[in-house]
Amino acid sequence: MLKINRKYAIILAIVAFSSFQTEAKAASISMLGTASNFGVLGGSTVTNTGPSVITESLGVSTGSSATGFPPAIVNGTIFTSDTVAAQAQVDNATAYNKLASLIPNKDLTGLDLGGLTLTPGVYSFSSSAQLTGILTLDNLGDPNALFVFQIGSTLTTASNSSIVTTNGDAPNVFFQIGSSATLGTGTQFMGNILALTSITLTTGVNIDCGRALAQNGAVTMDTNKVSNACYTKPQEKAVVPEPDSSLAVLGSGLVSLLFAFRKRFRKGW
């Protein structure tokens, strides 16, 4: 009976882990509609310099110009001034307005995001927002944790700034920006940028677990990587809680569990 229970425990852990990842990704897709299929979406144009990589599709609407591809690589499809890109912009605008309508939990106006550790919620800036250093997002073990940053005007990050997570990945991070975003050189960004005007990714900026979506203006790139794939780097992982804290932690310990029982599977139960 113990041997059977061990088998079931591993199977349940796999199912639970897969389910949590699917639900979290579905929540992000639901918010963005067809815009979720794009890594970069520009309103007037998308321009690139250097060997950038976009792991999803690239779109431009209502403009029609996407330059610098190649040398940049787009693993998805390039859509310019067509019905696919137009619908993505409609969905982008819908998501932008929905995010803007949410009631904030906390006003961060005047604070630098760098050095803060934030839990899921809606955070607002009446005007501009700045990130200098490291912003930590604590998911509290919730795979569907939602972080929304409502920014009245601009978002600017200093060189080599970063966003990291603890207690899980963060597929549902949204920056709703009233005008434009400029990410400083070497910034390691995480989350979806929905800017009313433009987005500038300077040299060496990477966006993980997110997208660069500009409604009316340009997206400007320079040797960047943009991917909606989510992951937690080893040094950013939190200590796994005791087993009785939540079913969600089964996913966190899945790899260790599989290694522990690998030899037993080979020998038979």
From Swiss-Prot:
Places the protein is found: Cell outer membrane
Motif interval(s): Probable ice-binding motif (T/S-X-T) 6: 198-200
The protein's name: Ice-binding protein
Pfam families: Ice_binding
Disulfide bond entries: none
Family classification: Belongs to the ice-binding protein family.
Chain intervals for the UniProt region annotation (PEP C-terminal anchor): 240-263
First and last residue of the signal peptide: 1-24
Motif (Probable ice-binding motif (T/S-X-T) 3): 128-130
Chain span(s) of sequence motif Probable ice-binding motif (T/S-X-T) 7: 218-220
Domain notes: The ice-binding site may be formed by 7 T/S-X-T motifs.
Motif (Probable ice-binding motif (T/S-X-T) 4): 154-156
Chain positions of motif Probable ice-binding motif (T/S-X-T) 1: 45-47
UniProt function note: A probable ice-binding protein that has ice-structuring activities in vitro. Thought not to anchor the cyanobacterium to ice surfaces, as its habitat is shallow puddles fed by glacier meltwater.
Annotated TM spans: 245-261
UniProt short sequence motif Probable ice-binding motif (T/S-X-T) 5, positions renumbered to this chain: 180-182
Topology relative to the membrane: Single-pass membrane protein
GO cellular component: cell outer membrane
Keywords: Cell outer membrane, Membrane, Signal, Transmembrane, Transmembrane helix
Superkingdom in the source lineage: Bacteria
Motif (Probable ice-binding motif (T/S-X-T) 2): 65-67
